[in-house]
Amino acid sequence: MKTTKTTTSRFENLIGQEDVKRKLNFYLDAQNKSRRFPFVLLAGAKGQGKTEFAKEAARSILGNDGKSRPFLEVNCGTIKNAQVFFEQVFSPVIQGNEVTVLLDECHALPKDLMTTLLSAFNTEKTDVKQVNWREGMYEFNFKLQSFILATTEADRLFPPLKDRLTLVDFQPYNEKEVAQIIQLTLPDIKFVGDVLERVAKTVRSNARSSVQRAKQIDLYCETKNRREFSSKDWADLCERVGINASGLVNAEIQVLKTLKERGECSLNMLSAVTGLSRGALQRDTELFLLQRGFMRIEGNRKITAAGIKALEEATAKK
């Protein structure tokens, strides 16, 4: 039997994102009374826990029997067009049933389906909306069905559809929250002294990276056949798997070295010197450096004082 969580117990195993929790709790409390849940858009960078928060919220969305509704997770990248959605997902699983649907990476929805959902989500005056698609008629009942959408690229959503959604946006995790996630993931491991804080400084401010670092520590402790992790162990692990100060990866170190040596660079020059494509630099390598304040872009790319310090720490033993 599924149990209903209270406002105070929801999300208790998820660290941080207090603003997200407050917003979702408000909408969940309302749904438990009215059976209507808004069309929520969970938006944030990769690894910030959108899917986990969606799953946890879904457990508190109640059906007419007062129990949690069934949950359906749809990877939108697998939906080729509206016809596939209606014939393979909506008709057999959603229509006429009580269900909470997560449309994950919803920016990847095909345009014809985004347009159709725009019509379906226009529900100012009714809980039931009938949508015609080609030769079929499909019925959405929003007292039976709730839709949660999640994306890392909200700017790619069809703007009119985005306007129909209730935004719940995520923030980066701070070092204290990162440390809490690692500790929660490894409840049986004792961290000695300030080693957990040192570990947290190398994590990329998101939940997924925190869990990945925790798994590395867990594997290390298993190989040593002990459940205690010290600063000496951390130094050994960093050496073995190549963990650098501030969590810098080799491509980022290469960019910082280039900027320090040359003073400043255009994107084309940085690409030529490092061998990384312009797209790879802009979409991946530069993002973390900009977020941490290790570089800035003022026409050309420049390293900052914080970037010089991070580079020196990351290359001190190299």
Describe the function of each predicted region.
Residues 21-22, 68-98:
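Short glycine-rich substrate-engagement loop in P-loop NTPases that contacts/grips substrate
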